Amino acid sequence: MFSFTKDIGMDLGTASVLIYIKDKGIVLNEPSVVALDKNTGKLLKVGADAQAMLGRTPGNIIAIRPLREGVISDYEVTERMIKEFLHKVMGFQLFKPRIIICVPSGITEVEERAVIDAGIQAGARRVYLIEEPVAAAIGAGIDITQPEGHMIIDIGGGTSDIAVISLGGTVVSASIKIAG
């Protein structure tokens, strides 16, 4: 069946953002950095281009990491960063994509809502969330629907998540703010 929309997977990490497009694989792997003109608020660069500016900018240009410890610390900048990355990998699209975004297992409902809202405002038709250990297990080819426990450890740039997964869900999990 032909689909007008794209399905996108996004790892919105503290250190980097990865974007996966169905049938294409990983199409973006860039640092979670945004360069802004602090006088005007204008977004100048995102990702690797913004990271290259760290420590090398005049006083009116600042480089920001809008995620801290696995969650959004600057909502508006995160939304703009997601929008730029989506435009970079998709160009202009008549139909909005569905996006599944990885989140740490221990985030609050408010933090979940912020991720969903940022994705919608950035141009997604629908945003789904998946816990990082579950996404890691699926990515590793583990059949998480089986009645077997699998311990998964996901060490990211802002959090480390540990979970036992069985029968399609998380049995127990912990997320700590210590990471690589």
Language-model-detected regions and their locations in the chain:
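Nucleotide/phosphate-binding catalytic cleft detector across ATP-hydrolyzing
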Residues: 1-155, 163-180
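Metal-dependent DNA phosphodiester-chemistry modules and their immediately adjacent helices/loops
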Residues: 160
